[in-house]
Amino acid sequence: MDTELLKGTLSLLILSLLERRAMYGYELAATVRQETDGAFQWKAGSLYPSLHKLEKDGLIRAEWQGKSEGRQRKYYQLTEAGRAALAEKTEAWASISKAVNQVLERTHERQ
């Protein structure tokens, strides 16, 4: 799959997954890989910088959780600003997706 096409969807999908519930980084990557039948395989080098940017922008917040003697995980959750951004990004994606599909469908109709 074209990685350039996938890059623009990273923050949208992160926000969408976090709307369901708080998740840690590996859980986000595993969930998106499973739900896209492997089309999206997020690497740490792209996922964590995106998470940090979303956190810096106030769209998500992070909290360490776990047992004191056990392994702690950094869980990310959506903020109210993140919910608003998700709504905007979802609407923008729907418009872009519709426009691209119209062009592709018309191209195939003419062939």
Where are these regions (language model features)?
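Short beta-strand "wing" residues that participate in macromolecule-binding interfaces
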Residues: 62
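Short secondary-structure boundary/capping segments
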Residues: 32, 52, 67-68
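Glycine-centered, phosphate/nucleic-acid-interacting loop/turn motifs that mediate DNA/RNA or nucleotide
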Residues: 58
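Basic amphipathic alpha-helical segments that dock to polyanions
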Residues: 47-54
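Amphipathic alpha-helical dimerization/coiled-coil segments
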Residues: 84-111
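Basic, amphipathic "hinge/linker" alpha-helix immediately C-terminal to the N-terminal HTH DNA-binding motif
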Residues: 68-90
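N-terminal helix-turn-helix DNA-binding core of bacterial DNA-binding proteins
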Residues: 2-46
